[in-house]
C-alpha cells in the first residue's frame, strides 16, 4: 500500500488526526475567549472524562532521565527475547502493542476501551535502546503519535485506530525500522 506523505514526510492520516485535534482545541480556545462565562480550566475533565489539555512538564524531551532506572544503559531489563536485556522504551512499546491489540478487539466488540494515552505518553521520557535517538526528531514524532492516541481515546473507531498504527509506522520509518513488518500486523484487518 502506497502511503501519501505530507508535512515533513508524515503519513496523511497522522496529519489529518493532528489537524483535527488542533482545530478542536483552537475552537475551544476561541469560544472560551468570547464567552461571558467564567474561563474553563483546560486541565479539568470534560463531560466524557477526557482532559481538555495536558501538562507534559513531567515527561518531555527536557526531562532528565534517571541513569539508575531499570532499562537505562547499563541497567537493561532482563528479557527472554533479548539476551542483552531491553531498554525501558522497548519494554514500554511491547506493552503499548498489547494494549493496542486489546483495544482493537474491544472496539470490534462494541466494548469500552482502556485509555491508552496515560501509558503511551511516557514514551517521551523513557530510556531508548540508543540514548542518542532521544532527540528533537524523535520527540516530534512521539508528539504526533500521541495526538493520534488521544484522538483514538476520545473517539475509538476503525479510522482512529488505523491512525495510531500509521503513527507507529511513521516513527519506525526513522528509528528501529526492523519492526515495521510486525507493526503492519496490527492493522484493523
Where does each model-flagged region fall?
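Extracytoplasmic c-type cytochrome modules immediately beyond a signal peptide or single-pass transmembrane anchor
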Residues: 38-166, 180-189
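The canonical Cys-X-X-Cys-His
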Residues: 164-176
